[in-house]
Amino acid sequence: MFPMLNGFMNYGQQTVRAARYIGQSFMITLSHTNRLPVTIQYPYEKSITSERFRGRIHFEFDKCIACEVCVRVCPIDLPVVDWRLETDIRKKRLLNYSIDFGICIFCGNCVEYCPTNCLSMTEEYELSTYDRHELNYNQISLGRLPMSVIGDYTIQTIMNSTQMKIAMDKSLDSRTITNY
């Protein structure tokens, strides 16, 4: 009789343990219901990039003095700077400037060390093409500013998690609680 009683007790303990595991997993599932979805519907929804995002490089031809600092600080010597020395004014004259984004590692050294700030990072990250030679941008295509994701009315913008935290902190700071 005792072995049968022990069998029922073991069965009861196993049932309670199984119910506890099911309850724990159900609680984990319920904790995920208030979270926002991780994925977005990409062509129609775009995530807002952070302030320090390193996208395509923007180049301003008129500011460049052809000093080639960007070439020297680039880990892969990527920017191609063509210039001619004007002997009458003893200055370099920039003829052509190009960057191949198929090779660029987007480190940002060229932007950081440029003495005239003619280079800047944009928020453009859609650089995919069918031909890799289209990724070689000259001074004309580098000079075009991309349309801002926020300014495009056909696309729904979605804030990422850090931007949502910043927005929540700002809204909490702006409220004042008074007791009457």
Swiss-Prot record:
Pfam families from the entry?
Fer4_7
What EC number(s) does its UniProt record assign?
7.1.1.-
Binding locations of [4Fe-4S] cluster 2: C74, C104, C107, C110
Q: Where on this chain does [4Fe-4S] cluster 1 bind?
A: C64, C67, C70, C114
According to the record, how does the cofactor bind? Binds 2 [4Fe-4S] clusters per subunit.
The name under which this protein is listed is NAD(P)H-quinone oxidoreductase subunit I, chloroplastic
Q: Which InterPro entries match?
A: 4Fe4S_Fe-S-bd (IPR017896), 4Fe4S_Fe_S_CS (IPR017900), NADH_quinone_OxRdtase_chainI (IPR010226), NDHI (IPR004497)
GO molecular function terms here?
Answer: 4 iron, 4 sulfur cluster binding; iron ion binding; NADH dehydrogenase (ubiquinone) activity; quinone binding
- Record's SUPFAM superfamilies? 4Fe-4S ferredoxins (SSF54862)
Cofactor requirements of the protein: [4Fe-4S] cluster
Catalysed reactions listed for this entry: a plastoquinone + NADH + (n+1) H(+)(in) = a plastoquinol + NAD(+) + n H(+)(out); a plastoquinone + NADPH + (n+1) H(+)(in) = a plastoquinol + NADP(+) + n H(+)(out)
* NADP keyword on record: yes
Q: Please give the organism.
A: Illicium oligandrum (Star anise)
Q: Which cysteines are joined by disulfide bonds?
A: none
